């Protein structure tokens, strides 16, 4: 009987739950009212047919669709999307008007290009939606075990599952809907759930059923089971659930601990039973499946303005043309009697010029419509898809360890990669690996652990390498006999004044890595290993330290059947590192039951492990507010212990007077660990007597079982009563390793002119240490720390006082930056989440942004996911420049979606960030190549491609206008309709696509060697209005040259030996030939990099024109019309036709050649110089010259290893100068004293 009561009491405890990952269960507004607004859902358990019988409570099916279209909506919705674009809509109107007599063209010459372009885009949409449909079919066809009645379960597809069904889910299966947990294979009704698909977290969550349904542990138990759930309506909040279960005449409150969400997976549990509460699109995961925000690049936005400019040009020339036609009709039409202007229905009736003007305006708008590039949008889409393919296939962006390539999840933002100004980065899992290694510890005032952290090794090694590159500058320093086993260390008495940071050699680093044989454990100190700790003077404290590590946690052990080793599933990587460390120290956590944990302790006299049981009485969960976790346990001797671990500031303030014996030494050790970039926690304990614990546990039980909005507050108060009078044992130091190549990547990005901000949830000390390791911070950099430490939260007007304090600190910091006279001075801004709350207020945020922009580094600590998104929005909207956010966890989704470009890292925290991102990479270091290489290329390609599009269409379209003016604004086209059909779609589209896909101003290795080239993108050198208008002007010039030369050569004179003169068709064909040559030769001159593909597309397009002209002219007259045998019999035999083409090519390209030659000679751009250096490098023997030119092509930066080394060299030079000055004074003094002594 006593055992049953104990078991019942333990079942009512929620010590298995990880509340640190959830907000409050209930709303802060107060108790919820079931059956009130928002809480009207009624679920009949095991009776799904009742929902079908009652129309008022009919719920959605479990069928899920993520497609944008279906068979009925595809055509109207997709057509709307296509004609939402201004250019496409214009050509739609033009195609409709082309069927009327007003059109100067054959209707098919207008309809066919439009159908081709729109059809291609719609085909792309259909393909993408088909892929989504097939994914939906796969998900909806999954099967689950569903109760059929009479205690029998059968397999049923997910789409046929209904609200109220009882479902049995097996281990490693996904939950098919949102379920209420009824029972599980564990006797206490718990189960372990992986929610990676929901929140991106890979750590297991623990769910627990109600005691009332605990007995439903077999299939037969559900034969007569029934109940009613009354709960909240469907909503997207993953972490709240309010409702109750009516069963057997009793009402039981429900909370999120009983809810199993769709798309989460059952882990470490044989099976569970649950009742379906929400199905299909009512489930929380589907309620959260909002579309990612639509993002458009800056180039695309500017392109819209250029299209509007071309429309203005179109309207202008159309207005001029129609006005000219009206004037000609009024003044001269009477003389042109053969046009029969006397007919009442005639458009050329001189008595009605206004009518003639209006009608001709429509004709002119159709005639000059080729000023608008109809194939621009589809060509850009094709180019961007191909660019994204090359990004995906780049082996330099492939992570061989994880087998993960880079992925361009959207192709709309390729060119935006080349215009980034500010990078906002998460820390854990992004800059660091999120792989925790136990490295050092402090126990009883003694520090243990002799191994250096990887961040120290990486920073020191990189500095030594940079110092070697600057050998000429360092050679002037007083160094000892050269390099010893270290890369660079100034030894001896002379060099002691100029001490550099110690740098470990590659061999030392290799040895250190070889010594690391256990994942999560990089500790090395023989004083604690192999039971040597028993010989330490404070062995009792060391024993308690190890036991706290092994017992105070919420982890789950899993035994590897092959190796017999225990692995651990824990709520954080830190806890895994603690358990691995305790195992290596001889205290292995082997088993957890509903009420106990078992530790195999290996320090007995026999040398064999002894299993000890610790009964868990209570667990006080870790939360971000509490910053600590405690376990109340009873050991085998019957002693009740409170074991506590948490942030040092929290633990230290809860120590008893007698528990502060090691406080001073431990604090010093924590500071040292923090400076080494390590994550720290303090450990303490307290012994409890039975009476004290019984009284407290009664209060704790009341708080645990309470139902109301203040439940969490009650738990916090009760917990706070117990977690005091602690005895300090020591502290841990865990290393969150830097990802491979992070320091070098940050250095190169800084030299490319990019600003880097770090937004992290870690404490300030840890973030600062990682900043030093990455060289975002360095010695000598002036840190501006904005905080609210001096503001009293209890004041009546605390918010106003906080904002006033922040504004004062920002103003003082801004003044300090302005009056700083040292040009090399660098400032770093550091702010925590609490202060950031006020700094992001509307009346403060722009002053805060101005200060942040003036600083070389910005580090925001202890920030929430919402604050990350708000900071990103402020940087994006406040500066007006392109921002990139990069992260790896679910808490980074907000800032990834808010930034202009979101980059997700496919790391250990799940795929939530990747799914929300625009680009995904496996490691932070790949960001350098993604931006500096692919970003630079894509920006320049797209910019040149768009400018060329406008050039070729202006060149072509204006020749029609000139011919109109020449022919009295007749509305007649000089070109055959088939020419118009081919111009944009065939004859000029492939070369421009090759430009957008293959163009390289410099190779990839040179992009990385000369990072300052990247600044051409943020400065928008290739798509500013100066360059755009220059290309347009070039198009106007080319059109004038082509028309005037052809008119002068072919008009009213023979062009063949037989005296034949050129008619309009011959002149039009010759002019069109010149256009094809001119625009294709122009694109060839624009390219800096040729492959055989580009040659084929450019010269093949020109050849295709002649082939078409020859073949089309051979068709019967009914088909070929007025170009019958145009090439073979009329133009080809005439030498003047070929000479005209050569003359036009020379005349149209000479200005461009003159411009580019002048620019390269007088005012070259960076890539021009680098191209020449690269070209002539084979004749350069002096490698130092190459390095010197590389250094010139780097942006001046105040962060990164380069800036760090520069600062160190300036520091050393200053010291040397001061020392030389002292020596000079001393030598001068001694020389003055010598004559006087001689005279005496």
Swiss-Prot record:
The keyword Transmembrane helix belongs to this UniProt entry's keyword annotation: yes
Record keywords, A-Z: ATP-binding, Cell membrane, Isopeptide bond, Magnesium, Membrane, Metal-binding, Nucleotide-binding, Translocase, Transmembrane, Transmembrane helix, Ubl conjugation
Extracellular side: 98-101, 329-360, 964-977, 1051-1063, 1114-1130
Record topology, Cytoplasmic segments: 1-75, 125-306, 379-943, 998-1027, 1087-1092, 1156-1240
EC identifiers of the protein: 7.6.2.1
Disulfide bridge map: none
Active site: 426 (4-aspartylphosphate intermediate)
Residues joined by cross-link Glycyl lysine isopeptide (Lys-Gly) (interchain with G-Cter in ubiquitin): 625
Membrane topology (UniProt): Multi-pass membrane protein
Main subcellular location of this protein, as a coarse class: membrane
Single GO term (MF): ATP hydrolysis activity
Transmembrane segments: 76-97, 102-124, 307-328, 361-378, 944-963, 978-997, 1028-1050, 1064-1086, 1093-1113, 1131-1155
GO CC list: endomembrane system; plasma membrane
PROSITE patterns named among the record's database cross-references: ATPASE_E1_E2
Binding, Mg(2+): 888, 892
Coiled-coil residues: none
Disruption phenotype: Ala6 and ala7 double mutants are hypersensitive to temperature stress and are impaired in pollen fitness with an altered lipid composition and short and slow pollen tubes.
Catalysis: reaction(s): ATP + H2O + phospholipidSide 1 = ADP + phosphate + phospholipidSide 2
InterPro entries named among the record's database cross-references: ATPase_P-typ_cyto_dom_N (IPR023299), ATPase_P-typ_P_site (IPR018303), ATPase_P-typ_TM_dom_sf (IPR023298), ATPase_P-typ_transduc_dom_A_sf (IPR008250), HAD-like_sf (IPR036412), HAD_sf (IPR023214), P-type_ATPase_IV (IPR006539), P-type_ATPase_N (IPR032631)
Gene Ontology BP, a term: phospholipid transport
Described function: Involved in transport of phospholipids and in regulation of pollen plasma membrane lipid asymmetry.
NCBIfam families, per the entry: ATPase-Plipid, ATPase_P-type
PANTHER family attached to this UniProt entry: PHOSPHOLIPID-TRANSPORTING ATPASE 6, PROBABLE PHOSPHOLIPID-TRANSPORTING ATPASE
Protein name: Phospholipid-transporting ATPase 6
Species whose genome carries this gene: Arabidopsis thaliana (Mouse-ear cress)
The encoding gene: ALA6
